[in-house]
Amino acid sequence: MWVTETEPPSYEDRAALARRATELARAAMPGVDVEILWDGMWVRRVGPDYFPDPDMFRLPASDAEPNWERWAGQARKHLRDAEDYWFYLYKPRPGDVIVDIGAGRGEDVFAFSRAVGPAGRVWAIEPHPVSFAALIGSCELNRLANVTPLNYACMDRAGDLQIETRPVWESNYVRAGAPSPASYPVKGVRFDDLAAEQGIERIDFLKMNIEGAERWALPGCEKALRRARYVCIAAHDFRGARGEGEEFRTLDFVKEFVAGAGFEIAMRDDPRYYVPYHVHGFRRE
């Protein structure tokens, strides 16, 4: 049986919880070099790799234990997923520049950083403060020196927004309007303005996965798209199809916008419900 955190108030309590969790994880995964530690948030070390996990002790009610197999193979999964989802057409080269809009907790950044190597650069943009803290932790602990994390929501104009927190963190989404009990304030920026401010000129690959906000983000990165070699924009019509709101139906808009930026478009026929909504853009040589 896994353990549950009750917001321990002291360093000693957290240290004891980390020791107990490490014992349980090692017992469940014999032969795996795993350690649970506290570094401003809960972190899981598996071999040489670190994975910040703010929800480590907040499992769904249906789960009595973590997915040990996933924990043991987390680094391999991140690398495999990037190859599957984002490197379908784009093939990274040492020295490339990748822009990751919707970087989450650093899952793809972990792979992107390795793919472009020390001479490359990854710009990782994530609006949710908890996810952004995990992203920073991942970059620091894994020494991803070629990654620059930025805490913004990419939109069509600058402004103050809210990011809504969902039970499954990957579904967090940006919106306008008043705060809610589950939202955080976030600064909205045009990516073209952010790119000018940060000196982002060359873009070999731009990935965007922002849970419906692609409808507003794409008009704010029109200049960047025109100088990118490859893009992959995730549309989210499947969220609209399951009743979460018509604003999530973005596929037609995304395809039109990407084509308008001069890209040829490729889609995938795939049984996974989200993969057919990845819009891959490439330029013919």
Predicted regions and their residues:
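Glycine-rich adenosyl-binding loop in Rossmann-like folds that engage adenosine-containing cofactors
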Residues: 48, 52-86, 145, 150-198
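Active-site flanking residues adjacent to catalytic metal/cofactor-binding acidic residues
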Residues: 99, 125, 152, 206-208, ...
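Hydrophobic pocket-lining residues within nucleotide cofactor-binding pockets
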Residues: 103, 154-156, 210
